Amino acid sequence: MRLHGEVSFDEDEEEVVMVPAAALSSSPLNGGAVPVTRLVVGYALTKKKVKSFLQPNLLLLARKKGINLVAIDDTRPLAEQGPFDVILHKITSKEWQQVLEDYHEEHPEVTVLDPPNAINHLNNRQSMLAEVSDLNLSSFYGEVCTPRQLVIMRDPSSIPTAVAMAGLTLPLVAKPLVVDGTSKSHELSLAYDEASLSMLDPPLVLQEFVNHGGILFKVYIIGETIQVVRRFSLPDVNTYDLLNNVGVYRFPRVSCAAASADHADLDPHISELPPRPLLEKLGKELRGRLGLRLFNIDMIRELGTKDRYYIIDINYFPGFGKMPGYEHIFTDFLLNLAQSKYKKCLSGG
């Protein structure tokens, strides 16, 4: 199978003439500044990811900045392709992960975005939020925590008893335990009453529902850059809802399918973005703990509070194409990687 999305350009477009990366080993140029070179980025993405991420505005800007995006063919040995400066990937198969790990062992000079073992940490919702719960990020700017949750591996009939023993409060949000890149793994269910809990389908994670004004903050992290957008989310649940609703209500991928809330006429107490210093501290901590540079955080603010936030999901290499100006942020990120690597080589590191 060939991974989709080979990048090509019209022959009559102006060609950018650049010094090959191999020339860097001869002598520093520009008084020690990073010399002009073409950065080769190999990508291994699904057809869906190619379409959403490698948009024309990104391809054009990358070319202008000297970034060469090359599709990786997984029917050929990876060592026979390239050479690459960076490998960008989002393929979930164990076979691909092993290929990538073997390649990186032979070519440690190639930057892999991101390491497969670090990505795997986010493929399980139990381990996903464990790092957040250990952060202890209470500060002047606010408190960051996670909803109380319970993992159910099997036997739906045992769920009501397990929930009662854990002391969780209804309603509960049910999410598949494993995140495998499919739309089904991002579906949500909302269970209103105890009797309906046995209708759920393990393995899953149950989280206490936190009223948040129906607004979700998607915090995109690309390296050290952070950008936040608002999305409409599940509506708040009140006492009337609990008394008059029974059963399980199923939802698609809410934060992805919902329209942007950035320009909606909202109560400022609900729509106000989390403080920038808090997000920067959170981003730095999670980059270090997760070992990732491309991810996003789904965050909500508890209704009626100004500074209590809950992280409800973390996603690797999310839909950056929906983020305003993503092409500038992402190409700058790639160039900064190259600059950091070059400076490290100059210093003998």
Curated annotation (Swiss-Prot):
EC number(s) stated in the UniProt entry for this protein: 2.7.1.134, 2.7.1.159
Annotated GO MF terms: ATP binding; inositol-1,3,4-trisphosphate 5-kinase activity; inositol-1,3,4-trisphosphate 6-kinase activity; inositol-3,4,5,6-tetrakisphosphate 1-kinase activity; magnesium ion binding
A family per Pfam: Ins134_P3_kin
Residue numbers binding Mg(2+) 1: 298, 313
Gene deletion effect: No visible phenotype under normal growth conditions, but mutant plants show increased sensitivity to salt and drought stresses.
Manner of cofactor binding, per the entry note: Binds 2 magnesium ions per subunit.
Cofactor field: Mg(2+)
List of residues binding Mg(2+) 2: 313, 315
Organs and tissues of expression: Expressed in roots, leaves, flowers, anthers and embryos.
Induction: By drought and salt stresses.
SUPFAM superfamilies listed in its UniProt record: Glutathione synthetase ATP-binding domain-like (SSF56059)
Entries under PANTHER family matching the protein: INOSITOL-TETRAKISPHOSPHATE 1-KINASE, INOSITOL-TETRAKISPHOSPHATE 1-KINASE 2
Protein name per UniProt: Inositol-tetrakisphosphate 1-kinase 2
Source organism of this protein record: Oryza sativa subsp. japonica
Lineage: Eukaryota, Viridiplantae, Streptophyta, Embryophyta, Tracheophyta
